[in-house]
Amino acid sequence: MIRDEARTALIVGATGGIGQACARSLHAAGYTLLLNARRSAPLRELSKELGASYAACDGNNEKKIRELIGTAANGIDVVVHAAGILKGSAARGQSVETFDEVIAANLRSVYVVVHASLPSVNVGGRIILVSSTTATRPMRGLTAYSAAKAGMNAMAEALAAELESEGINVSLVSPGPISTPMMDQSVNAFSALPADDVGGVVAWLAALPPRMVVPDILFRGPYRGPFAEMTGGGGSAGQSIAEARALKAART
């Protein structure tokens, strides 16, 4: 929906499959965009295409995130956190360093971005955090990722309680498997949805009137059975997921 008034959206993780879909959906809805991602070349290309301001940095870099936000003369109406990494293995084989890396990318950066954004979020604004169904259905081999997403969900609930009286909504978008490069190595009993579907959900949330509070939207693709074809199953995360699915199928 094209809005009559100028609106601004900050998207963190803008060059990933989901982040890029969110950027395109909000651009189509008439938003001025502030884009952030770690990979400078694709970020620069996307920003040029969408006429956006951008900052190439990690989502944990509060200084650069604040500088990007500072370019929005009239504040921010929508904040989308879609950054993250899917990395790791079963706990016996996963280092503490890898655990810390996953938590930093998927959880700590959420707080950094929200903390940097809040002074500039307009009344009636919405903070949208892209979570995952693994937050409530943790998967073997994804201990750090599942813990990070569960932490994001708890953070969102606490933030919503704090900010609702200020006229700022906090919403979680929790998709099942999405067809993105990050998910290509995993296996699931549910069909993967295109990233554009997540972008559509985010744009729909952004278009809602502020009086509508939507704490969480959870969705997935259609069920396709306990066995699924896997790409890159030899990888530690993919192999662990495949083993878990096979074990579950054998018990039913």
Predicted regions and their residues:
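Substrate-binding pocket helix/loop in short-chain dehydrogenase/reductase
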Residues: 90-91, 95-103
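Residue(s) in the substrate-gating loop at a strand-loop-helix junction
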Residues: 132
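C-terminal helical subdomain
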Residues: 172, 187-232
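Active-site helix of classical SDR
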Residues: 114, 148
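Rossmann-fold cofactor-recognition segment
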Residues: 49-63
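Conserved glycine-rich cofactor-binding loop
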Residues: 15-16
